[in-house]
């Protein structure tokens, strides 16, 4: 552990702060976190936080969710412009237009979305909870926003529902094609292909396992000397290579990188602790609507 990491660990106790980090964050940032997880795990951990402050090492929608679930706490996002391109593909007005078009449908909103979009949805979901959330709803028609790839995957798992898709996606996952999957299998024929459902349908169909980042990690950890092609952001590849030195871990693409997730540096976390970052603030009405959607997700899951 370096000097900067030691300083952060001392200060977070002094300032009564909980540090959370997503699996896609740089490893040195993960190392100073109190908890590392996928979007669902981080939302649950934020909800149960006892500390007066939360530093969310991730992207903006994650920090917004932490604030929504903890309106009385101070929440920081270390890098203000760490956004999510998928979240930017849809607005609250887009959701309201879909509601008007499909008045009998429930709106399921992937957590990779803004607080404003969550506020006009019925319930949120993560990649690990999406199927359970969709099954929990009495409506036959489900508007699934914004990720068309996750929505298409869930439509296959729950064929009794009519899933209405929105044309949004994660550009990092959507850039991976069936040709990439075939090439990776040819290069590593002994390896199992583990992919995230934000990937295109042609990639998910080619996989041995489809699941959340936590699910991918758990699957690989169960075979510590196995061979795996990792079909999600390379932060997961980095974690597995460090944790499982006897395993053979290959990225599905070498450039499978979310630039926004990699923006966070240790110095940014320190700036939060030393008061040089502006906390997350959201309109009260937006927070109230979004909180209902997030809390329903957590209750169902």
What are these regions, as identified by a protein language model?
Residues 1-230, 234-301:
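Active-site loop-to-helix "anion-binding N-cap" substructures in soluble metabolic enzymes
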């Amino acid at each position: 552990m370096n000097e900067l990491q030691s300083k952060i660990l001392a200060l977070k106790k002094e300032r009564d702060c909980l540090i959370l980090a997503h699996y896609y964050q740089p490893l040195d940032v993960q190392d100073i976190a109190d908890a590392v997880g996928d979007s669902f795990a981080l939302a649950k951990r934020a909800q149960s936080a006892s500390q007066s402050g939360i530093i969310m090492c991730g992207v903006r929608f994650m920090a917004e969710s932490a604030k929504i679930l903890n309106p009385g706490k101070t929440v920081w996002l270390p890098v203000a412009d760490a956004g999510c391109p998928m979240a930017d593909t849809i607005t609250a007005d887009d959701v309201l237009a879909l509601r008007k078009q499909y008045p009998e449908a429930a709106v399921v909103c992937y957590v990779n979305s803004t607080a404003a979009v969550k506020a006009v949805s019925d319930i949120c979901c993560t990649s690990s909870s999406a199927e359970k959330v969709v099954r929990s709803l009495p409506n036959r028609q489900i508007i699934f926003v914004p990720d068309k790839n996750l929505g298409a995957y869930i439509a296959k798992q729950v064929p009794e529902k009519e899933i209405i898709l929105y044309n949004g996606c994660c550009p990092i996952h959507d850039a991976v094609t069936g040709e990439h999957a075939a090439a990776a299998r040819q290069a590593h024929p002994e390896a199992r292909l583990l992919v995230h459902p934000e990937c295109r349908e042609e990639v998910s169909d080619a996989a041995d396992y489809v699941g959340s980042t936590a699910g991918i990690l758990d699957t690989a950890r169960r075979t510590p000397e196995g061979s795996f092609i990792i079909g999600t952001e390379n932060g997961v590849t980095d974690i597995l290579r460090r944790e499982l030195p006897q395993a053979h871990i290959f990225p599905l693409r070498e450039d499978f990188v979310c630039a926004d997730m990699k923006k966070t540096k240790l110095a940014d976390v320190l700036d939060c602790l030393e008061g040089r970052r502006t906390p997350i603030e959201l309109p009260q009405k937006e927070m109230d609507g979004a909180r209902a959607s997030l809390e329903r997700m957590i209750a169902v899951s």
